[in-house]
Structures are given as structure tokens and as C-alpha cells.
Amino acid sequence: MPSSAVAAGVAPRERSHTVRAFFFVTAPADPGLLSRLIEPVAKLGAVPSRVHASRESGDGSELSVELRLAGVAPRTAELVEFALRAVVGVRQVMALIEVEA
């Protein structure tokens, strides 16, 4: 049975909002890591609004990377999160995704 909105000839509301996504990644310091982290973002057609990387863990053996996206579809942010978790060498990914006003 069709919903009352469809029966009344009104189109259902589309999910047209965008989100901001913040990703915090830790991994062993490796020369190819940054390019492996940026690649899935580029493949999804997004451009990071910020990328910051620093060597941590006292001896510099660990890399901490902050990656931000703005104005992307919620599904794009979710796919980036999944892709970052699948990058070889990544130990941890923390993601914060919030709806833009």
C-alpha cells in the first residue's frame, strides 16, 4: 500500500543534507602511508579540507593523521571511513561525522 505522501502526489523528502567528517588515523610511520590514506578520498571524488600528519610515540615510529572532509554526502563519509580502516598498516581510525547546518 502506498504511503499517504505518495498517494497525495507529494514526493518523499530526499536526503539532501551534507556532512562534515573528521578522521583520526594512527599507523606505523611509513613513507607510503599518506598517499594510501588520500587515495580512497580521491577515488570517491572528494577533496579533503584539511590533512595534518605528525610523527608521534617519542621515537617517531608512529604516524598520527587528521583528515577532514566538508560538504560531502553521508554515504561518501561512511565509505571513506571503511576505506581508511582497510588501508594496510592502519592501527586505528576514529571518525566523527556531523550534519552541516
Predicted regions and their residues:
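A conserved regulatory-domain signal marking ACT and ACT-like small-molecule sensing domains
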Residues: 2-101
